[in-house]
C-alpha cells in the first residue's frame, strides 16, 4: 500500500465500478508498476446489521460483492470502457430484445465448483424479473427481454447482477479475486487473494482486503488521517 492516504470518490465508485475504485485507492501513480502484497483496509459507509450476500444495497456491500468476492458478466474499466468479465462476448438479435452471452471457460467458484451457464441463469433470473434467462449450453446463456434494451451489457456490470453458484447463492462464494474469510454483518468483511485467477497480472494486487464499517463521515476521516485505514469513503 502506498504511504499516501486515499479517499474514495463516491461518484467514481458508481461510474467505474467497485473493482476500479478499489484499485484507484492504492494511491499508485499511473506510471508506477503495481506490486503484489500487503493488506488494503477500507473504511466505508452504508453497512447494516441486516446485510447478507443477497440483501444489502449500501456502499459497503456493493464493494464487498463486486470487485472482491463476486464477478459480473461484464465490467466497466477505470477509463470507462465496457468489457467482458465472466462473459467473453455477447451478441444481440431481434432489435436488442434477445441476447446471447458466451461464458469464460475454466472459471471456478471459491469452493472449487466450475462456473456453468446454470449458475448464470439462476443468478440472473432472480433479478431480471421481466426477462427469460435460459441455458443454451454449458458456456452459453440466452436472455430474452420483454422490451428491447441495447444497454443490457452495461446494465449487467452493476453489482446487483453478480454471479453466484446455483447450489449456494447465499453463502458468499463467488469467482472474484478474493475469497471470503470473515463476514460480520454491518461491521466487517475480510477476504484473501485467491491463488490463481483469470485476472492475474491485471488486478488483485493485495494479499488481503478488509472492509470496516464506519457510519460517521468525521470518524472515517479521522481513521484515515491517523493511518488506521488506507482509504475511506469521504464524498465531497
Task: Label each region the model flagged.
Residues 89-129, 136, 142, 223:
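Aromatic- and charge-enriched surface segment that lines or borders ligand/interaction sites
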Residues 196-236:
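Ligand-site clamp/hinge motif
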Residues 25-26:
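N-terminal signal peptide c-region/cleavage motif recognized by signal peptidases
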Residues 125-166, 177-184:
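Surface-exposed binding/hinge segments that line
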Residues 43-94, 173:
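N-terminal lobe/hinge region of extracytoplasmic solute-binding protein
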Residues 171-200:
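Bilobed "Venus flytrap"/periplasmic-binding protein-like clamshell domains
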Residues 2-20:
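N-terminal secretory signal peptides and thylakoid transit peptides that target proteins
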Residues 37-46, 98-101, 141-142, 176-178, ...:
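Short, well-ordered beta-strand elements
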Amino acid at each position: 500500500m502506498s504511504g499516501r492516504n486515499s479517499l474514495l470518490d463516491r461518484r467514481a465508485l458508481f461510474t467505474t465500478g467497485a473493482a476500479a475504485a478499489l484499485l484507484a485507492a492504492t494511491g499508485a501513480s499511473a506510471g508506477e508498476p503495481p506490486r503484489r502484497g500487503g493488506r488494503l483496509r477500507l473504511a466505508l459507509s452504508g453497512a447494516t446489521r441486516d446485510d447478507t450476500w443477497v440483501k444489502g444495497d449500501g456502499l459497503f456491500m456493493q464493494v464487498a460483492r463486486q470487485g472482491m468476492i463476486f464477478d459480473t458478466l461484464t465490467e466497466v474499466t477505470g477509463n470507462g470502457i465496457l468489457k467482458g468479465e465472466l462473459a467473453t462476448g455477447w451478441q444481440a438479435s431481434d432489435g436488442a430484445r434477445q441476447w446471447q452471452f458466451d461464458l469464460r471457460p475454466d472459471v471456478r467458484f471459491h469452493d472449487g465448483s466450475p462456473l456453468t451457464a446454470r449458475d448464470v441463469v439462476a443468478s440472473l433470473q432472480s433479478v431480471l424479473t421481466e426477462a427469460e434467462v435460459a441455458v443454451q449450453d454449458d458456456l452459453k446463456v440466452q436472455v430474452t427481454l420483454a422490451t428491447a434494451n441495447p444497454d443490457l451489457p452495461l446494465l449487467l456490470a452493476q453489482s446487483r447482477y453478480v454471479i453466484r453458484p446455483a447450489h449456494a447463492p447465499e453463502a458468499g462464494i463467488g469467482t472474484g479475486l478474493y475469497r471470503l474469510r470473515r463476514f460480520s454483518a454491518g461491521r466487517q468483511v475480510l477476504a484473501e487473494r485467491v491463488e490463481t485467477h483469470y485476472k492475474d497480472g491485471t488486478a488483485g494486487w493485495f494479499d488481503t482486503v478488509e472492509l470496516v464499517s464506519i457510519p460517521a463521515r468525521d470518524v472515517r476521516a479521522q481513521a484515515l488521517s491517523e493511518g488506521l485505514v488506507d482509504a475511506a469513503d469521504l464524498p465531497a
